Amino acid sequence: MIYADIHTHTAFSPDSRADMADMLERAVALGLKIYGVSEHFNYDYDRLHLQIDGKEVPPIDEAAYFSRALQLQAAYAEKLLFLVGAEFGFDHSPRALERYMRTAEEYRPDFIVNSIHTCLGMDCYFPHYCAGRSKEYAYNAYLYRVLESLDAPYPYDVVAHIGYCSRNATYPDPKLRYEEFADVLDAILRRIIAKDKILEVNTSSKTAGSPFLPDTDILARYFALGGRKVSFASDAHDPSRIGEKREVVSEALKSIGFTHLTIPCRGEHLRAEL
């Protein structure tokens, strides 16, 4: 069974309204031993002036977030290991990279999730990313962005939700399949292993044609290449989704050959048995 969920969001992220204490209470009620928040640091959005619901996304209040999270980390220390993290939306612009490096240095999050949200000038989460583009073109563009992000100059621990572009894709078969993108996926997986990063299994798959991202075919290839470090992420933005599909993910990982999760914690990799 999985007792660690380290990629979630609260009201400090623009797409959540959840109170952090409520999220922690839910994690405790579920019997989690390790719980983490990794709020959005959307400096990739800034350059593109992207909007959500017709409004530009405001920058996170870094000081307020870390202050509140560290207060709760101390308050819940006897109930679970609460990790205070950050999700960096990769962008190659010097301004974004400098801001991420500054955040990592100033606040020293317990862990950092590296992710791709923006591609071809937009957030590839939304259906319009597919408009006028073939699946091959749209997914390749996204995957090569993932590959580029692995060489980010800032420190990071986890490679997030590979297949993010498929979450709301409008193709008849939206699933990101290893066999269709083998070359670039192999390059990604090999680099994750070479850099000793952690591959995230994210259960916020929406309508991607998969119960989690990446799906078992990609996870099996990662294992075959020697990858052993995986983490679990519900990507919950409200308490009801914390730990979602953890039984399904646990069984899938064990069927491939994985025996444990890897938890990033202040520069160390902790082991949590499946």
What residues fall within each predicted segment?
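An N-terminally biased module of ancient metal coordination in phosphate/nucleic-acid-related enzymes
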Residues: 1-95, 168-179, 238-244, 249-255
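Charged catalytic cores and adjacent phosphate/nucleic-acid-binding surfaces used
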Residues: 1-10, 20, 31, 120, ...
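Hydrophobic faces of well-ordered beta-strands that scaffold small-molecule active sites
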Residues: 4-8, 35-37, 82-86, 112-114, ...
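Histidine (H) residue identity feature
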Residues: 7-9, 40, 49, 92, ...
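Extended substrate/RNA-proximal surfaces in nucleic-acid metabolism proteins
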Residues: 55-194
